[in-house]
From Swiss-Prot:
Protein name: FMRFamide-related peptides
GO terms for biological process, alphabetical: neuropeptide signaling pathway
Sites of Leucine amide modification: 158
List of residues that carry Phenylalanine amide: 45, 113
Propeptide: 22-33, 69-104, 116-150, 160-190
Positions of the UniProt region annotated as Disordered: 161-190
Classification of source organism: Eukaryota, Metazoa, Ecdysozoa, Arthropoda, Hexapoda
Function per UniProt: In insects, FMRFamide and related peptides have modulatory actions at skeletal neuromuscular junctions, and peptides that are immunologically related to FMRFamide are released into the circulation from neurohemal organs.
Cell location: Secreted
Compositionally biased region (Basic and acidic residues): 175-190
Acidic residues composition bias: residue spans: 164-174
Length: 190
């Protein structure tokens, strides 16, 4: 009798566990609404796959920023692009148009971090034809003449320029030092 009770108890326990472990079937609409509500309330970390890129997106991704003068910031890696034949044709046509038109303006300085040109770099470009940029530039900083080394002309000057300083200004007389010293100040000693 105790054996049959044990078997009956195990069968009942097995049925309860089996019933609770199987999920309840829901309608597809209800399930879709539940999933979209969860998706809206969650913060996702990780990669998301964007919709198919357009030809303009592909053109923008493949353009060389130093050629067109575009400025951009990119941190990390972007998703790989999937190209269709229409996108490739429009991309090739855009490149033909870019290389047929003469370049009117180049920028001698750009921003890049790291060695790869896809990243941001701070400082001057490593182009060999820097002289072309310096000759074409019409930079005049507050009336100063342009010098051979023009890097200083691109910054704001604070104080006196080294070309204006006279050697006579460094020679001070004893009287001018005494005027500025704290020893001659009567209010300071009290």
């Amino acid at each position: 009798m105790s054996c049959s009770r044990t078997v009956a108890l195990l069968a009942a326990l097995w049925l309860v566990v089996g019933a609770t472990s199987s999920p309840v079937r829901r309608s597809p609409d209800l399930e879709a609404r539940r999933r979209s509500a969860i998706d809206r309330s969650m913060i996702r970390f990780g990669r998301s796959y964007p919709p198919e890129p357009s030809a303009a997106d592909i053109r923008e991704a493949f353009e060389r920023p130093t050629r067109r003068g575009n400025s951009f910031l990119r941190f990390g890696r972007s998703q790989p692009l999937t190209l269709s034949t229409d996108d490739l044709v429009s991309l090739l046509r855009a490149y033909e148009e870019d290389y047929d038109t003469p370049m009117t303006k180049k920028s001698a300085s750009f921003v890049r971090f790291g060695r790869d040109p896809n990243f941001i770099r701070l400082g001057r470009s490593a182009d060999d034809d820097k002289s072309a940029f310096e000759q074409n530039s019409e930079l005049v900083v507050s009336g100063y003449p342009q010098r051979k080394s023009r890097a200083r002309d691109h910054f704001i000057r604070l104080g006196r320029d080294s070309e204006e300083v006279n050697e006579n200004e460094f020679e001070e007389t004893e009287e001018s030092r005494r005027k500025r010293s704290a020893d001659s100040c009567h209010d300071c000693q009290s």
